[in-house]
């Protein structure tokens, strides 16, 4: 079994110093080079290409026995799915896909036991008519873990015994008969996604032990798994004893439903093909996303308790549980792999408010994990750490840049609209060359608005989520029932950010005019336009806050932990 991630003091000092040098180099590019955004984006693409052509090929050079292992089917894997009040047709599609994937068993976890949660149990019964009745837990296993943490924190077998006893007792079977079950459903009182994941993982490990198989595959209840995906993802684990987890590519199955879905589809594709691939070139992945992740069962056993009970600054964070679980696996010494050709499709928000809530949830969890696990990064590859730091700091730099530019008209970075255009052109060319067989040509027209949309909105979400890091919830449903409402501070922040970017755009437009007109516009802007925009933003935010739906978002998605 891998040993916890460790590095000598000299190695950690070297990593820190190298990271500082890399970060300084990136800062120098933004300050000194004419097209910094283009240079940075081109560098990221080159590293992604390197990983595709060389690093991945080297990592996949297995011995003949390993190749034979990779040709096995998913019969050595237990498939898991978790959800809360999912739409019935979406959930049915998810379970049908798992059933068709030829896994040895399916474990379904439902985070709720009230009347509103019963339709999910009905869907499970329809898809698996021969399965035993759903198993109800009066108290989630996670509650018992937190209440008696000191007594059982070091004993995963005790938690597994609790779940196994519940299954065998309620089904009226002996332990030896667990291997005959092909699908089970467990439901418990509503808590949060992390709580139902813990229960489902424990049940999955119980089933894996009973069937004597080494792997688990987990997805969300709104995910559709392609027929060969599970086998493709698990194939990256079979020949590598040090591999504790792997994930596949996520695509949006609502990509044709709305303009916002199109933007998300293009953004997801580029992020996974460039951002995730370039960090994979360093041997590390920061997140195994919930819709597609495979685990070695022994790796999960090693980290489940520390993952679930982890806290920082006296608080537990239950958002972005997948990212935190990945960090725990890395810290325990396990390797994490990315399999870009293994595809799953997942549900995405179709409304702007739903999208905003989803992004906030993800970003809050990212902040919590990075800040609470900061010691982990001193043991990682310096480039990986530099990438994480750049991702953390650049939104704040962008905000400061916009404010300074609006107030003074000066640019302390050499960013410009021309740099934005050239960077987009580089991204478009790369997309055309690498995604012609995976993205419809008609969808490429959305690349430009997707680039602009995420470039303008990411800093706002990133900054706001840092200051609201401890707001936890499932973060869904996206578009079910009443429209998800934003809180008054969220409206105020969004309104202020919109007007800040608008003010910066007007300022940049004035720079492109002749000297006299530019001076006149600047004077008018300083005296009239900017104060008016701020006042209008405040009034608009206040109005939207007063007219928003009275039901709070947290009342729609469940309790906040």
Where are the language model's segments positioned?
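Juxtamembrane membrane-interface segments at transmembrane-helix boundaries in membrane proteins
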Residues: 1-11, 21-27, 383-386, 483-490, ...
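Short hydrophobic helices that act as membrane-entry/anchoring signals
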Residues: 11, 15-22, 26, 44-51, ...
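Juxtamembrane amphipathic/hinge helix adjacent to a transmembrane helix
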Residues: 369, 373, 470, 474-480
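Non-transmembrane catalytic domains and loops of membrane-associated enzymes and transporters
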Residues: 63-385, 389-393, 560
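N-proximal low-complexity "stem/linker" segments adjacent to membrane-targeting elements
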Residues: 2-96
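Short, low-complexity, Lys/Arg-enriched N-terminal segments of secretory-pathway carbohydrate enzymes
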Residues: 1-10, 461-462, 475-484, 556-561
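Membrane-embedded multi-pass helical conduit in multi-pass membrane proteins
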Residues: 30-41, 388-473, 490-561
